[in-house]
C-alpha cells in the first residue's frame, strides 16, 4: 500500500485512519447535486451530469465517494475522479469537505486515499488536479500530497486554473 495506509474493504469501500470512503450510486450523486445551492449547482458540468444520468452501475471512476467520519458516522464531504483514466493513464481527482470539518486534515486524508486507489489500480501513470489560480486550502492539500505545480491552464469547464500533477513512482 501507499503512504495513505488505505485498506480496501468491499469493492470499493476505502478505509483510512479517520475516514470511510463509500462508493456512491448515480441516484445519490444526483440527489446531492439537487441539494446544492443554485450557485454551487451552476458550477457542476452539464456533461458530467449527463454521464451520471446515463450510468447504469456505480464505479469508482465515475460516481465518486461519500466521505464519512469513522468515529461519528457523519457524512462530511465527497471525493472522487472526474472520469476514468484516459488513454495516457491520467486521472483527475476532486474533493470537498463540509466547512464544519475543514482544517482538520480530512481533505488531505481523502486525497491521499484517492491517489493510492488510482496508482494501485495499474491504470494510472499520473494523478492530476486543478485548483483556482491562487494559493488556498486546496493547493495546500495537493502540496502535502506531493503534487507539483505545472502552471496555469484554461479548462473548458472552469476557465483559468492551476494544474497540479503527481506521477506514479515509475514515472518519476
Regions found by a protein language model. Give the residues of each.
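Conserved beta-strand-loop-alpha-helix junction that forms the acyl-donor binding cleft
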Residues: 129-139
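Glycine-rich acyl-CoA binding loop
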Residues: 105-108
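Conserved active-site tyrosine of GNAT-family acetyltransferases
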Residues: 142
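GNAT-family acyltransferases
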Residues: 1-92, 96-100, 113-121, 126, ...
Amino acid at each position: 500500500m501507499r503512504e495513505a495506509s488505505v485498506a480496501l474493504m468491499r469493492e470499493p469501500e476505502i478505509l483510512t485512519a479517520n475516514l470511510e470512503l463509500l462508493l456512491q450510486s448515480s441516484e445519490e450523486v444526483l440527489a446531492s447535486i439537487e441539494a446544492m445551492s443554485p450557485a454551487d449547482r451552476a458550477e457542476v458540468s452539464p456533461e458530467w451530469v449527463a454521464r451520471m444520468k446515463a450510468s447504469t452501475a456505480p464505479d469508482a471512476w465515475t460516481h465518486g465517494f461519500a466521505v464519512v467520519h469513522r468515529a461519528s458516522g457523519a457524512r462530511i464531504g465527497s471525493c472522487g475522479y472526474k472520469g476514468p483514466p484516459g488513454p495516457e493513464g491520467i486521472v483527475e481527482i476532486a474533493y470537498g469537505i463540509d466547512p464544519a470539518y475543514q482544517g482538520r486534515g480530512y481533505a488531505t486524508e481523502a486525497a491521499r486515499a484517492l491517489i493510492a486507489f488510482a496508482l494501485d489500480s495499474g491504470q494510472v501513470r499520473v494523478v492530476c488536479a486543478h485548483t483556482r489560480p491562487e494559493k488556498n486550502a486546496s493547493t495546500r492539500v495537493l502540496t502535502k500530497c506531493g503534487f507539483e505545480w505545472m502552471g496555469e491552464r484554461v479548462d473548458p469547464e472552469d476557465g483559468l486554473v492551476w494544474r497540479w500533477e503527481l506521477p506514479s513512482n515509475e514515472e518519476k
